Amino acid sequence: DDKIGTNNKKITKKEFDYIIISPGIDINQCNLSKFLKKNLRKIYTDLDVFYNHYEKNNKITITGTNGKSTTAKILYDVLKDQKADVRLVGNIGNPVLSEKKVTNSTVFVIEASSYQLEYSKLFKSNISLILNISPDHLERHKTINKYVSAKFKLVKNQSKKDFAILNTKNFYIKRELESKNYLPKVIKIEKDIDNNFLKKIDNKYFDTDGNKENLKFILKVAKILRLNKNSLLKTLQKFKGLKYRQEIIFNSKKLTIINDSKAT
């Protein structure tokens, strides 16, 4: 059937130039599944529309199974404290198409899920971060390979002048890098660690393994952007984390209580 519609009104597929799909829609499980599968080349995402409108703006995009929101918020705070016109959008902050009064100097920090990236065709980021990958959302993606591919759309669409910051100790990230050639400059968080700077950070929030890892990503971005280290240190010292995500709710010499109830 080449027609879709509700009630008595039918619309032919020829009337569509583009289909902007919501991230929550799985084309394999929806009422329009047959129609959408026939028209995959016409499907775009909100990230694609966003990129088409703000192609010249600097974009830093974070994805991964865990730690996306926290890392995005730290990076947003860091850039804001450095007096940048920075916007926090995507899965955290405002929807990507809701920002107003955007100028050429506006920087976007974007949290992107696998759902948002899966069908994207145009979107690309100047700096991409893949924090980690572990089996998740397989009810949607069906296989771990498809889930990894959705995450790596972020890197696949980048050019040689872009940066991909990756945790190459992660099994799935390492395997993907070894099996394909990607264009951007790959920066491994395990390499060239600024231990002298790390020693200056006196914030118990970064004592957990996950947050130590997130911190390494922040430092790599800071190096690429040549951020002021004194300002960076001040921001990191005062960061308290997001609620329910490795949130320290009590701390003493003998006991630390962490609320990580957001963890899935």
Q: What residue ranges belong to the model's regions?
A:
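Flexible active-site lid/hinge loop adjacent to a nucleotide/diphosphate
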Residues: 102-188, 193-207
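Nucleotide phosphate-binding/pyrophosphate-handling subdomain across enzymes
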Residues: 85, 204-264
